[in-house]
Curated annotation (Swiss-Prot):
The active site is at 146 (proton acceptor). Residues 817-860 form the AGC-kinase C-terminal domain. The keyword 4Fe-4S does not apply. Serine/threonine kinase that plays a key role in M phase by acting as a regulator of mitosis entry and maintenance. Acts by promoting the inactivation of protein phosphatase 2A (PP2A) during M phase: does not directly inhibit PP2A but acts by mediating phosphorylation and subsequent activation of arpp19 and ensa at 'Ser-62' and 'Ser-74', respectively. ARPP19 and ENSA are phosphatase inhibitors that specifically inhibit the ppp2r2d (PR55-delta) subunit of PP2A. Inactivation of PP2A during M phase is essential to keep cyclin-B1-CDK1 activity high. It catalyses: L-seryl-[protein] + ATP = O-phospho-L-seryl-[protein] + ADP + H(+); L-threonyl-[protein] + ATP = O-phospho-L-threonyl-[protein] + ADP + H(+). It comes from the Eukaryota. InterPro entries: AGC-kinase_C, Kinase-like_dom_sf, Prot_kinase_dom, Ser/Thr_kinase_AS, Ser_Thr_kinase_AGC. This is Serine/threonine-protein kinase greatwall. Its main location: cytoplasm. The modification Phosphothreonine is found at residue 722. The gene is mastl.
């Protein structure tokens, strides 16, 4: 088979490298948190493969690009009989394809649903093989971090192979190279089972291309939540074709700037002129991305939205380009150049030939343009009421004509000067900016001194981006019993302008009404608590908050979905998933810690009216204990310990980095209350806190280390895993290592023997409490576990990581007596798949059915 694969590849190697076009799709297999898995066949032979398809845009939006690389690297480096083999890592402009071996036996979770639970011998063999796989990974500096029955596949012979390394951690601070693939330390002389063709090796060491211009724009807009220029850009991208320019022209015709109405709208919007204006801009987009100063202040405040595929105009286009190249009317009502408005547009070939000549004409046109801009601002100072870009400037602002000679027209270097020109080029109208009062303060800044203080955000601006509150006004919060606190909050704060406080006031009134309509069965949900009790609550909750699932993605797509603040935007995200699919994702949504990274503790102590955004959420002790606080939505797919066989379906989807889950998933879990942190005043009256991040960061909602409890967290260690299988050190905010996998193995052993995870409960909060309290419901009576099996579980589920068992301790344990560790892959397995044919995927259907997952779609 391998010889045929090599011959097939060698015959085409002179033509092209391996491509996804070399495969033919057979059928879908399953669906996970980040993509779908398909059964496919290679065109040149009959060998079957399992292809995992992941969209690049989704990984960028979820801040999971590093995890995508980690999964590919972990599979490429692993050459073990107990780990799924990766053949190819292919990609297109929008998707990544991991071509792996197809294991026809399905996953252990499906088998567990069918069996109910495994007997002791069956559990012993499965756990032994998984233990060897974990030991192999740990010796190669790979932490799986998502070990669960769902990610254990059964081969044709019935053996176990680990898969789904999407949450793994690989200690490889560089790109894979040829030697990493060919010389795995444990296999100096690789056997033919791990032989890779040249095309396979080439695909495995290639870059995943997650930093393309299209994706880069999305990366900035997803992470720079606090940037005043990033809000509302979704509209510009959705309407793509020069949207800010088209709006500007239309508003210009209706504004006082246009003293004469001589120019007809069709003379500006003609298709000929539109095509003429876009061509040179697109030619420049690639060069601009290559030369932009990444470390500059303005790169952070004004991230690139250049998207060559969507024809989005760059935010830093200079004044001359917008008026000369695009033939936009001057601010005083005159045309830029009557000759150019009458010229016949050039073809793309002619434009490229004449481009140097056009570039030489930039400077002569620049000076009169700036004079016109300056004069128009002096003549009409009252335009701030109509348009943001013509607002009043600082008296110390440098005139534009003084900065023009320093502007480099031919390149894309970003300097402070172009920001001044920006105000009269592509700024949107006042009524188009959702958060106008807050953004106006930054938009009016014109001098260098103002931008030297760019990270010291004004008070109103820091409260402008409301993150979560916009979501809760759309998603029903039936169980929120906080109407008195909301009413008190509204009475204390009431600015008349369109500010975040007013917005929050309206939103909390809606929550108040919904809370009253949702029932009054929880009289204990009072808001009167002594300061001492609140400190205890904050302490207990902060222990569960930091490095656990609490840093989930309640804010994953916030900049894109909340910029419009319309129900249509969010409702469309829910329409993509039916109720069953939402129920499969919902258990991943959990409380978040969403405090800004660059705010000090002193800044967080403020007036009571600032509690909506700057303070965490105070919760009374009775509220935490009340059934209403812990009551899940109907779609939350958690089962009780005493329910039927399907009760253990809580572990179905891998929880991504909890800074990066989809908004639809997190919004569907309405009980997500943010835990209270240390060093916070007790006068916080809001139940939800909105992040106010203002700088580019891969983890923008990370709590400042100054308020963390426990040891300082290791750098670059996001919170990953599935609720039932999370180790306590993750919930306690401590640095974690490979011992988290051994904890998860103990959870799996308990689940194999009983049919349900040991810490399973109705809500994620209760699951976390069970883990931290090590509350294990041991079966009794006829279902009681043997002493050896129970002790094996206990040494794996040890709270102290230094005392937790590993492979060495398991080999010496009485429960594993008689296990031939050196020949596990030759032992007879208790279950051997008997498929109807080679394309049979029925062994995967049990888990899909139990978790209400529907797999559809046949497009790669």
């Amino acid at each position: 088979m391998e010889a045929r694969g090599l011959a097939c590849e060698s015959s085409n190697s002179a033509v092209k490298a391996p491509s996804i076009e070399d495969f033919v799709l057979v059928k879908p297999i399953s669906r996970g948190a980040f993509g779908k898995v398909y059964l496919a066949r290679k065109k040149c032979n009959s060998k079957l493969y399992a292809i995992k398809v992941v969209k690049k845009a989704e990984m960028v939006d979820k801040n999971m690009t590093e995890q995508m690389r980690a999964e590919r690297d972990a599979l490429a480096l692993s050459k073990s009989p107990f780990i799924v083999h990766l053949f190819y890592s292919l990609q297109t402009a929008t998707k990544v394809y991991l071509v792996m071996e197809y294991l026809i036996g399905g996953d252990v979770k499906s088998l567990l649903h069918i069996y109910g639970y495994f007997d002791e011998d069956m559990s012993l063999k499965y756990i032994s093989e998984v233990a060897l796989a974990l030991d192999y990974l740990h010796r190669h500096s790979i932490i799986h971090r998502d070990l669960k029955p769902d990610n254990m596949l059964i081969s044709n012979e019935g053996h176990i192979k680990l898969t789904d390394f999407g949450l793994s951690k690989v200690k490889l601070d560089r790109e894979l190279n040829l030697m990493d693939i060919l010389t795995t330390p444990s296999l100096v002389k690789p056997t033919k089972d791990y032989f890779r063709t040249p095309g396979q090796v080439l695909s495995l060491i290639s870059s995943l291309g997650l930093n393309t211009p299209v994706i880069e724009g999305k990366r900035h807009s997803s992470t720079v939540l606090g940037s005043p220029m990033s809000c509302g850009k979704v509209k510009q991208r959705n309407r793509s074709l020069g949207s800010p320019l088209m709006k500007r022209r239309a508003e210009y015709m209706n504004s006082p700037v246009c003293t004469s109405r001589a120019l007809a709208s069709n003379s500006v919007f003609s298709p000929v002129l539109l095509a003429r204006s876009l061509t040179p801009r697109l030619l420049k987009s690639g060069k601009r991305l290559d030369t932009m100063s990444v470390g500059s202040t303005h790169s952070c405040m004004l991230p690139s939205t250049t998207d060559s595929e969507n024809c989005v105009s760059p935010m830093w286009e200079d004044e001359q380009n917008l008026h000369d190249v695009e033939n936009i009317p001057q601010l005083n009502g005159r045309e830029v150049d009557n000759r150019k408005s009458r010229n016949v547009p050039l073809t793309p070939v002619e434009k490229r030939k004449t481009l140097p000549a056009r570039a030489q004409d930039h400077r002569p046109v620049f000076t009169p343009l700036n004079n016109q801009v300056t004069n128009s601002r002096n003549i009409k100072p009252d335009l701030s009421a109509k348009r943001l870009q013509f607002g009043a400037t600082d008296n110390s602002a440098t005139p534009l004509e003084k900065t023009v000679p320093h502007q480099s027209v031919g390149n894309g270097l970003i300097k402070p000067e172009p920001l001044k020109e920006l105000k009269s080029s592509v700024k949107r109208a006042f009524e188009e900016v959702e958060k106008s009062p807050e953004q106006a303060e930054i938009l009016f800044k014109k001098n260098d001194a103002a931008y030297e203080r760019s990270f010291q955000i004004p008070e109103k601006t820091s409260r402008a981006h409301t993150g979560l509150t916009g979501i809760f006004s759309i998603v029903g919060l039936d169980d929120v019993k906080s109407a008195p606190k909301c009413q008190q909050f509204n009475e204390r704060t009431g600015p008349k302008q369109s500010s975040p406080i007013a917005v929050a006031k309206n939103l909390f009134c809606e929550l108040e009404d919904q809370g009253e309509e949702g029932g009054k069965a929880e009289p204990n949900s009072s808001s009167s608590t002594s300061p001492g009790d609140e400190r205890n609550i904050r302490r207990s909750l902060s222990l569960e908050s930091d490095v656990s699932a609490h840093e989930m993605s309640l804010v994953a797509n916030t900049p894109q979905k909340l910029s419009d603040a319309k129900q249509e935007v969010l409702s469309s995200s829910f329409e993509e998933l039916d109720e069953n699919e939402i129920s499969a994702v919902t258990p991943m949504a959990r409380p978040t810690v969403a405090t800004p990274k660059h705010s000090s503790a002193k800044q967080r102590r403020g007036e009571c009216e600032r509690s909506l955004l700057d303070h965490p959420h105070g919760l009374s002790d009775s509220m935490i204990k009340s059934p209403g606080f812990l009551k899940p939505k109907n779609v939350v797919a958690f089962r009780s310990y005493c329910s039927s066989i399907n009760r253990s379906c809580t572990s179905h989807l891998s929880l991504a980095s909890f800074d990066a889950m989809e908004m639809s998933a997190s919004a569907s879990f309405h009980n997500a209350v943010t835990p209270v942190q240390k060093k916070r005043p007790s006068l916080s009256n809001s139940l939800y806190q909105t992040p106010q991040q203002m700088v580019v960061s891969h983890t923008p909602y990370r709590t400042p280390k100054s308020v963390r409890r426990g040891p300082e967290r290791v750098e670059g260690a996001p919170i990953l895993g599935t609720p039932d299988y999370l180790a306590p050190e993750l919930l306690l905010g401590k640095p974690h290592d490979f011992m988290v996998d051994w904890w998860a193995l103990g959870v799996c052993l308990f689940e194999f023997l009983t049919g349900v995870p040991p810490f399973n409960d109705e809500t994620p909060q209760l699951v976390f409490q069970n883990i931290l309290n090590r509350d294990i419901p041991w079966p009794d009576g006829e279902e009681e576990l043997t002493l050896n099996s129970r002790n094996a579980i206990e040494i794996l589920l040890t709270m102290d990581t230094l005392k937790r068992a590993g492979l060495k301790e398991l080999k010496d344990h009485p429960f594993f007596d008689g296990v031939d560790w050196e020949n596990l892959h030759h032992q007879t397995m208790p279950f051997i798949p008997q498929p109807d044919n080679e394309t049979d995927t029925s062994y995967f259907e049990a888990r899909n059915t139990a978790q209400h997952l529907t797999v559809s779609g046949f497009s790669l």
